[in-house]
Every structure is written in structure tokens, then in C-alpha cells.
Amino acid sequence: MMDIRFSLHPTLLRAFQRALAIVLVLGLLLSISPPRPTQAESDPAPPPDAARVIELITSLSGEEPFQTTRIYDRRGILLADIDDRGRRTIVGYNEIPDIVIQATIATEDRRFFQHQGIDYLAIVRALWQNTQSETIVSGGSTITQQLARILFLSPSERYEQSIQRKLKEVELAQFLETYYTKEEILAMYLNMVYYGNQAYGIAAAAEVYFNKSLSELTLAEAALLAGLPQAPAMYDPFRYPERALERQRTVISLMQEAGFLTSSEADALRAQPVLFHPYQRPRNRAPHFVNYIRDILIERFGTEGIHRGYQVHTSLDLRYQALAERIARAQVKRKGKKYRFSNAAVVIIQPQSGGILAMVGSIDFNDKKIAGQVNMTTVPRQPGSAIKPIVYAAAFERGWSPASIIWDLPVYYTLDGRRRYAPRNITGRFYGPLRLRMALANSLNVPAVKLLQAIGIPAVLETAEKLGIKAWRQPQDQYGLSLAVGGYEVPLLELTHAFATIANQGVYTPLYPITEIRDGAGRVVFQAKPRETQRQAISPLAAYQLTSILSDARARRMMFPRPSPLDTSQITAVKTGTTDGWRDNLTVGFTSYLAVGVWIGNTNNKPMRNAVGVYTAGPIWHDVMEAIWADESLYDALGYADGVLPQGFILPPDTVTIPVCDWLPGKFTPRCPRMVEEVYPASLPTSLPTGRDRGYCLPAGAAPSPPEAYFLPLPKDTRSAAAARNWVRKRFLRAVQHLNDCDTTPNKRPLVKQPKLLPPRQWVLSAEKMKTSVHLQASNQYGE
Amino acid sequence: MKSAFRFLSFLCAIWFLAACANNIFQITQSAPGEIDQAASTPTPTPTPYYYIVKPGDTLWTISQKVGVDIEVLIQVNELSNPDVIQPGDRLLISKKVTISGKPLPTPTPTPIPCMQGCIQPPEGCVVKGFRARLDGMKLYVLPEDAIYPVQRGETWFCREEDAIAAGFVRWTPSGPKIP
């Protein structure tokens, strides 16, 4: 019964009384007309569960009721609610405690279980009371009428005081009573009605005002909530607690009148204090990630569709998130002034599951000075040298190997017929013949550009796409040779994803930031299936070859002298990047179970000062890796709950290791200073170089060897070949002869002394023994 | 014979010295600080100065795309009512300032056609097909759709029928209707 006390203009009041009288008469007439279907009486529907309530409301009102969507981290910690339209969690009839039902019925509609939708007794009484007091004391609306109003009338119609509206309402209420059970009507009502403070439905109300689930509500609390729907703004417990408590007293009295409480119970209840525990929104501890998830949800379910009460379980681990954020912030604080950078971003990916464990889009979401709200892990930026492994991956896919030789000598390319592009190394020097291992490990630009030129831009674009880089979607002719040195923008997330694919033996797993989605009724609507969607992006051998180079601390010594943040306590593969004009610094690295990408720079693209990836982003990457290893309790998120992480990387089957002659960049001599082992497919290309492949013989290890092991070929094109020949002549004063037919028999080598064979590299690990920890000795081959 | 031997050892010595010199030279040359800055790019991506507003863009989506704080966008463009931006509006993204404090003459306005790495549609073809990042579902959107600009376009169609024939489902604000 309406219980709003406020004075009304006498004419309005009279109009209202007249309206009520007409309603009464018409209602009597209408109540006779629709007979209740016999089927409903003989076989009453069971009390509706949550799914049924949603179904009923959807079919009646024509749209699915909105509900709070919740986003959880991987361990079930609530990250954020999506409740822009209001908070609601739909519950089934049996989940609603009796005390709530009793309090509601006593307050709103005492004869709910007896009447047929219209309570004439109540209307008569309301009419009489209103006439007596000259104000509206109560209206005679039943719960069914109120539900009809909520379900069928538009918000503007709902509050209109007109005869037409009232008539429509009566008709609709009787329709509801005819086709639906009392439990269904009550369940719909308790889930739809507004309790104030964005709380729709009783479950949301319990949460908003008491931070409790329905079953935890006390009688006093239930009585308080039951009083709110009449005038949620007027009785707002947060703004007017004394009014809300007074209202609660009224509800208790009404419950007593209705016989739900004895007088002593009611007195005890009145004496009981009611404590409000306002619902605390979860502090958004991963705002960029939550926005990213929201984006994905909107993309699939639509802007309206996301308000369907989904339970979204994500791959994010708040412990990893907090760790990455703390380390990134500390580095910006420590080195930001020196190198003039103000922001950092970190992303951590689990390669086997495609899960994102952490996404730090900026060091402070709320800092406007650094445009903290911009997610720097998803904004495309130039990757610099960090892109080179993708180029090498494409090359290894096409028959090149880490031992293949490339000549680092001055070269230029003519672009669009006129401009010249002459790639240069960062040191400004050229290093002569190099094995690809040395070229990549020391991040030399000229060999990367030459390699790209040799294999072609389409090949690299194709490999990049397979590995997980989706940003390069322009037509192929839009890309130039600067692709090899990171001239084309890639988001950090995609770059790290590509590294994760390499870490996972070349097996691409789509990113699965969302692991599972359940709808409001608890049904699974989406489940991440990494195993079923994986595909081999590059061969396991190519992935291993890349990994072995990127984890070869010996090979990169020339450019990355000790102590370097790239050297970690466990075996890792890593690459840094620095872009033109010191704008972006990157370090992306991985183990077999973890890929971490770090970006450092200024969101507004302002150049830094003399900042190179290894000393700005490198320490963040290093510290994140070490912090994860140091805490065994974190290993469960990586799939190793037993506390033992695998070491190194898996050597693919059907491969052989062969010693090849090796030298430091720029220090080539025909007498090999040392031999190192390279991995080759078991089916070796063993054809001997022919007379046309001009070049120099090198000492070989054991036969059979691939030609590149004992033969240093000159470049194919004549201009480069001449430059290469000159380079050799200048250095070796014609001491070296061209040998067109290198003799590979062990005792007939062209040079006198067989050089010492280095012990196996750090990264070599026996296959399928991922879990066995391998003891490794630090080796000291380069005389450090 | 002897002189030949002397000559050879002389050659060897020179070679040795040259090698040594080379080594020393290299050690002094490898500056550890400067590592891997990418070489100058022949086709550099132009620094964005202006952004042309596309249908469905909001300041928020633009700020995400261009990596500039929404507040900055409002301030720099002196937007009196940031809720109202029209397709075709030109938004200043970055201002180049000379040492004297005078803004540089702006180069030819460079619209950023596809910041997210999407492909330009063929003339008159605006039906954009994409795969949802959640589950790879094939969906298509039309320019009036709210999410139209933020999608990474994958496939362009000139008519809706073509998209449907290719297995794409219409995206709607309340989620795609699956036939």
C-alpha cells in the first residue's frame, strides 16, 4: 500500500479519488472476463530459478534485464564491475530468504497470495483513508500491478497519474495473474524493483547497503530493504539514515499486523541497531587491462550486451600485475630524470595458454601529465631493433641458419628510383663477414637489412603475421627495407606475443586474456581453448635457432658488455630495441614458460636523452624476471605449481649439432680462432660449393658438414662481391687464396692448426626433459 | 731462399701488427653505451599532426588511438563542448614548437587513416568484417555502428550480402544475432 505522505492540491486530490473509483468499478468488470487457464491450476510451475526469471522478464518486457557484469582475475579476485546501467544480480525464487518475502508482502501487498492481481479491499481502504485525511495516505497498488508497471510501461508512463495509465496497469496485472504463478510474479518483482543507489533487485540491494549476500541478511536488514522501493530517494539510507530507520520501524509494525511477527519479536527487532556497510567498489588495480577486456566484450556482445551479468574470468594475475607495476614505477623514478623518460609499460604473457598475466599500460592511470589513461601496450609504436628476430625467423624458415654468412659492408639501396638508403650500424662501423648468430646477437643493422633484402619483405610480413603481429595490415608495397630495423609500428602486446610464439617452440597460441565467461544464469558461454586453436607458426627448429641466439650471452658481448641487465640468473632469450631519435626503448625476452615485454619512453613521443633499450627498459625486464623466479608461490600461474621451473629450451628432434668456425664481429681471420656448435636439421644440405661459388675455405669440424661450415662464400651480386674481396685483400695482404674446392677430409684442411672446440653453449638442453634442471657452467670463451 | 724466408717473416710480422692494431682499434671503438638504435628509416612513419574525425569516433577512442590524453586533446583544440565532435573535424594532435616559442608552420595536414593498422577500404565499400578477439567469431559492422572505428578492419565488403555470404554475422549493440 502506498504510504507516501505529502499534501496535494485539493483539485488534484479529487481527480485522483475519482480515478480510483473508476478503477475500482472497471477492475471489478475486468476481473470477471479472463478465466484462469485450467492447466496452470492443475500443474503449477515450480518456483522459478534465476535462468527462468531472466527468461520470463525477457519475454514479457521484450528486452533482457541488465545485470552487473563482473571481471575477475585468474584466482577469482574481483577486478571490476561493469554497472554503468545499474547494479543487478538476478536470483531464483528459492534463493530469496523468507524474511525478505514476508517483509515485502507485509509492506506492499498483504493479501498478495490471496488476490487475483487487484486488491479491492486495499483500494477501498485507501480511498477511504485519503478522503478522511485530505492527503494521499496510500494507494492500492498490488505487487502484481507494480510489476506490470515496471515490465510494460515506459519510465515516463510509469509515474503518470492518469486514468488511462491506471486502467492499463490493472489490465496488465490481471494478465500476469492469469498466466504466471505467484512465485514467478514475486520473483520477477523482487529482481526488478529499484532500491535506490543504483541497486536494482533485492540481491543488489543487499550488496549495496550491507555488502552481504541475500542469505546473510538479518531480519532487521530485510525489513529495512523492504521499505525502500516505495520512495528510494526519500528513504536513502546513506543520505537520510534516520528516515530509513523510521521507515524500517513502519515495516516492522506492518509485519506485526500481518502476523509475521509477535509483538515481543517486533519490539526486540526495533531495539536492534542496523549497521550499514556500503558496498566498496573494487579498487581498480588493473585499469588498462579492465578497459582492454571491456573492449573485447563490447566487440563480441555489443555495447548493450555486456550488461548481461556475465562472470568474466581472466588470465590476469594481480600478483604479477602488482609486481610489474612496482618495478616499472621504481625504474621511472630512479632513471627517468637522467634519460628524460616519464612512462613505462609492461606486458607478461604465458606462451602455452596465451594468457596475459600482467598488463601495465602506464605507470599511473590517473596521472594526466603522462597521459596515464593511454594503454601503451596496445598503442602501436616503432619497435626498433626488437623487431629483428622476426626478420631472422623468416630467414631461418627459408633455409638460412645461425651459421649462414652475411657480409657487413657498406651498401646502399635505391628507393623509388632516386633516394638512396644506406643502412648503418649504431657504432658507425662495418664488421665484414659475419655469421647470422653474431649479427643478430649484436643487433647489427646492415646485416638485418641485407637479410630482409635477400628474403623479401612479403616473407617477413607473412612470418610476422603468423607469429602474432597483426598491426601490419597495409598492402605489401607500403613497406620498405626499414622494416628490418623496426621502422613500422607494432603494439608492445603484439610484439611480446610474437616472442611468446617463439618461446613456445614456434607454436602460435591466440591471446586468451579471457579464460571463461558465464552468463547471469551460470551457463558457460565462452571458454578459452588454447590447445584447440594453436598452430605451428614457424618450425620448432627455426624457433630454437632464434632462441639459441637470443639466449647466447657470449655472442652478444661485443655490444652488451658485462654487467648487463640482459644477463639473468636463469637462462633467458632477450632482445632490446631503441628507435630513431631516442623515442622508444624496448626490451622483450622470454623463457619457455614466460614472455615479458617492456617499453620505456614518453607518451607524447618526446625524445629521451641518450637512452638505449638495454639500460632503460632492460633493468625493468631483468627485475621482473628475477622477482618472479624469487617467489615460488607465483609458479602456479605459469603451470608449474610444484615449484620447479624448467630450465633452458627444448632442442627439437631430428637435429644434429655440428662444429663450425666462429669469430667475433670484425675479427675474421682464415685461421679460425674457435669452433662452436650449431644446430642443423638431421637432413643436412651437404652439397659441396661449386666453382661458381667463389669464396674462402675455413677449417671444418667433422664431416659431413654443411658448406657454410667450411666455406666462406662471397656475396652473389658482383658489386658486393668486389667489395667483399677488397675487404679480405686489405686485411690479409693476399695471404689468403681463393679456394673453389674446399677439401673437407679431416686431415687435408687448408689451414694448419685445428682450433679448439668450445664446450656446448649454455642453452643446449636435451629434449623432452623440460622439468629437469640442468647444471650449467659459465664459460669464458672470449677471454673475459 | 733465405731472403725469401726473411721476406715471408717480414710479411708475417706486418700482418701480425696489422691484426693487433685492428684489435686495439676495435676495443676502443665499441662504445658500450650506444647499442642498437635502428638506422635511419627510408620510409619513416610521419609524425601525426592532425587527426580527421571518423563517424563513430569519440574523444576517448581518438585519445587511445593517437596516444594523447583526452584532456590534452580538449585543451589543444580548444574544444568548448568536447561531447560534440563531427566526422570530418580536424583535431590537432601534436604541436611543434620552436626554441623561440613560435609554433612551426604546420606541414600539410597528415590525416591518420588507420592508426590501428587497418586496411583502407576500396572506394565505396564500407562493410567491415572482422574477427572478435574473444572467440574469433566472424562479425561485420557498418559505419553507423558504435564500434566501427575501433575495430581492426580485416575484410572489406561492398554489400552486406557479400559479408553474409562469406560467413560474417551482423554486429548489433546488444550482441550479434546468430542465425
Model regions and ranges:
Chain A
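N-terminal type II signal-anchor transmembrane helix
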Residues: 2-72, 89, 111, 131
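Soluble, non-transmembrane domains of envelope/secretory-pathway proteins that act on or interact
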Residues: 27, 33-48, 58-59, 72, ...
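Non-catalytic, structured segments within soluble enzyme domains
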Residues: 33-39, 135-326, 451, 462-477, ...
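Short pre-catalytic segments that frame enzyme active sites
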Residues: 54, 70, 78-89, 204, ...
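Extracytoplasmic
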Residues: 64-69, 73-77, 86-88, 96-102, ...
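Conserved catalytic neighborhood of penicillin-recognizing serine enzymes
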Residues: 129-157, 215, 279-285, 400-460, ...
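Active-site-proximal helix/loop microenvironment
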Residues: 273-279, 470-524, 531, 535-537, ...
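Active-site beta-strand/loop architecture of penicillin-binding DD-peptidases
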Residues: 294-297, 342-385, 390-394, 465, ...
